Structures are given as C-alpha cells and as structure tokens.
Amino acid sequence: MIKLLYPKFWQKRNIIAYILFPISWIYQFLGFLRHVFARPVILPAKVICVGNCSVGGTGKTQIVMYLANLLKTQNIDFVIVTKAYGSNLKEATIVKAEHSTLEVGDESVILAKHGTVIATKNIKQILPLIHELKPSIIIVDDFLQNPYFHKDITIVSVDRQRLFGNGFLIPAGPLREYPNRALSAADLVFLVGNNSGGIPVSLASYANKLIQAQIVASSDIDKNKNYFAFSGIGNPERFFLTLKNYGLNIVGYKIFPDHYNYLQEDLENLSLLAKTNNATLITTRKDYVKIGDSSDIIVCLDVKLSINNPNLLYEKIFKKD
C-alpha cells in the first residue's frame, strides 16, 4: 500500500494540481463505472457506514468508537467492520487480542477494544462471519464509496480545518468523491474540530443533519514535562493541536506518512531527538499500537469525541426504519 503525506497542493491549488487534474477525470470515470455495474449486497443487519469525502484523517475512528460505546449502553449487539489499512490481510478475519497491526491494521487493533471487529479488504468476504455472529447492527468504518453493499445509515465526517481541500478529486486533490453528492445522500454530517467560528458556508445547507464534534484528550498526562511529538496518521495537525489545547509543552514534532509502520531505526532517531530536547516522546494511540517493545518509554495520548447534539444522533440511529 502506498503511504503518502498530505501534499500542500491538496489544500491550495498550484501548478501541480492543475497538471494532475486530467487524471482526476479518469478516477471519476472509474468510480462512475463501479457504481453503474455494482450489485449491492444486503447484509442481514442494520448497517451504519462512517466515511468521508476526502483522503486524510477526519475523525472517523473516534466517531466509530462513540457509536460503539453508545450501542453498548443500549445493550445492542453490534459488529465493527474495518478496512485493514496497512495490513497483509488476505481474507476477512475476526480480530483477536493476539493479532498485530501488520496482520489486521492499526485501526482494527484499536477498535477491537470497543467491540467485536471484522477486518477485511473486501466487504463481500464478511458475509459468513456476519451470519456466524448475528449482530443487530453493523458499524462499517470507511467503505463509504464502496457500492457493493447496502447502507441503511450513512455518516460523513468532515475535518473543520481542511474541509474539502482544493476541491479536486484524487490525485489532483484530496477528494474521493465530490462533497455535494456525499453530503446530500448522508443521514448525518459530523464536522470535527474546534467548534468556534460557526458552520462553514460550504456546509450551511446541511445544517439540519450537522453534528459539530471535537476530539478531546482523555488521558491523564503530566503537564510539567517537555514533550516531543510524532505521528503517522491522516491528520497530524489535529493531533498537535489537541496536545496544545491539553496544555502540554511541545518542544518539537515529526510527521510520518499515514499508517506508517515504524522501524527500529525510526524509534532510535526519535529517542535521540527527545533526549536532545530534554523531552519525553508522545504519540497517538494509532501509532502507539505499532511501536512494540519501545512503547514503555513513549507516552500515548488517548482521545475521545465530544458532540454538541447527541439527540440528533440518537434519533437517527434508534428511530430510523
């Protein structure tokens, strides 16, 4: 799997974006063909699909965690289906405690602490496992653009800072599909980020289905130390902002590509940077689960989702036919 950083031209158009724009037409046409010829499978449970219009972190994982915890409080049997990014997975697998991130993906390992998880790269492979587990609800993490299964409820996550980038499709921009289509079809739109500033103009027409959300720290971390931060996630800027809002003194940071698998050399270099700055290393839970034996010298920041309108979410999840 190709791992890329979020290039600057994805946020603000430049000559590179315009050069790549014709390739975006090909991407769009291939997506159109997928939808034309797809025959969606109807899964034997209510399906809640959480996804986004664009590449990069938009808070999907935190939304899935929130939904999982919500369903637990209602004693509803559910299963989480993940896309197994960064893994060498060949077939759909129920995630166990002994599975590594290389086997099932980092998000699968994290979400397995919140409920039963099926990791897969092909949504059609989950059918035998779903029949075995017999959940009432299936939470699908990603697969929003996948036309091969029926979705009962769709939730689109949007990052408040990046929104829809430069407005171009991959590879000229960050978009997997144009926002108007995804947002119009969505049952709920989560705007994830600092709630100050009101609703962006591009989302104003979706205010009746909009939930504003913030990702906040849920860890108890010593604020009297210096920290050197690092991450290999889709939106590292939000992680660094969360650290700042938590009141930590960040003396430096290093960004790795999304879903990055750390080498021993990387960890040694990070340790040297931290030592040089008289600091302690700090990272995200997604990175932490991939570090292995070095995790005892690194602080992990856990986060959770805080939303402004839980009643709207409850209404959609529990009252929709």
UniProtKB/Swiss-Prot annotation:
GO terms for molecular function: ATP binding; tetraacyldisaccharide 4'-kinase activity. One of its GO terms (cellular component) is plasma membrane. Its EC number is 2.7.1.130. Disulfide bonds: none annotated. GO terms for biological process: lipid A biosynthetic process; lipopolysaccharide core region biosynthetic process. HAMAP family: LpxK (MF_00409). This is Tetraacyldisaccharide 4'-kinase. The gene is lpxK.
